[in-house]
Amino acid sequence: MPEATPFQVMIVDDHPLMRRGVRQLLELDPGSEVVAEAGDGASAIDLANRLDIDVILLDLNMKGMSGLDTLNALRRDGVTAQIIILTVSDASSDVFALIDAGADGYLLKDSDPEVLLEAIRAGAKGSKVFSERVNQYLREREMFGAEEDPFSVLTERELDVLHELAQGLSNKQIASVLNISEQTVKVHIRNLLRKLNVRSRVAATILFLQQRGAQ
């Protein structure tokens, strides 16, 4: 009986060391073959449109084009490969954004290597694959509905910053009100924008005001 053809994998991550580690893990499985690597979203899109790839392992937080933007572009281009997010982020906002955008799986980089490899194998066969923490988020969303509080992923301090931001205060003014440094304010704003999956202070403010008005 002829051996089954290995499924073709592309690894997309802006950290060379991580790409090497994932490649070494996949090389333990004769049923898989890494045929491409990309260090950024644009390169991944180019390779995905030129090569016959079965599985794309896509990092979320990359320099330049984010994993979400890359995923959206791949789907717009009609790429049919199984796209599995492989990331350190277990924020529910990231999970829902990527899955709603069409990801076929969401795996965490701190997963046990054997568990990770088994999940990738299952994904190559067409299954939806998620780490346990991600499955928990999905079960909770199904149980309580998609209209959950979008701010539940924020820390108390991030909520404080967002509240002041929505009042139109500058970073310097927020720092004064909350008695923290202006640099700390910038860090909190960057983190809350990422968690809320919005790109600007204005978008975060609009979301905050809309949600507050709905309550």
From Swiss-Prot:
Domain HTH luxR-type: 147-212
CDD domains per record: LuxR_C_like
PROSITE patterns: HTH_LUXR_1, HTH_LUXR_2, RESPONSE_REGULATORY
PANTHER family, alphabetized: NITRATE_NITRITE RESPONSE REGULATOR PROTEIN NARP, TWO-COMPONENT RESPONSE REGULATOR
A GO MF label: ATP binding
Pfam families in alphabetical order: GerE (PF00196), Response_reg (PF00072)
Statement: the UniProt record of this protein carries the keyword Cytoplasm: no
InterPro entries, A to Z: CheY-like_superfamily, Sig_transdc_resp-reg_C-effctor, Sig_transdc_resp-reg_receiver, Tscrpt_reg_LuxR_C, WalR-like
4-aspartylphosphate modification, residue list: 59
Upper classification of the organism: Bacteria, Pseudomonadati, Pseudomonadota, Gammaproteobacteria, Enterobacterales
Highest taxon, organism lineage: Bacteria
DNA-binding region ranges: 171-190
One biological process term in Gene Ontology: regulation of DNA-templated transcription
Keyword annotations: Activator, ATP-binding, DNA-binding, Nitrate assimilation, Nucleotide-binding, Phosphoprotein, Repressor, Transcription, Transcription regulation, Two-component regulatory system
Protein species of origin: Escherichia coli (strain K12)
Keyword Transcription: yes
Biological function: This protein activates the expression of the nitrate reductase (narGHJI) and formate dehydrogenase-N (fdnGHI) operons and represses the transcription of the fumarate reductase (frdABCD) operon in response to a nitrate/nitrite induction signal transmitted by either the NarX or NarQ proteins.
Residue span(s) of domain Response regulatory: 8-124
Protein's name in the database: Nitrate/nitrite response regulator protein NarP
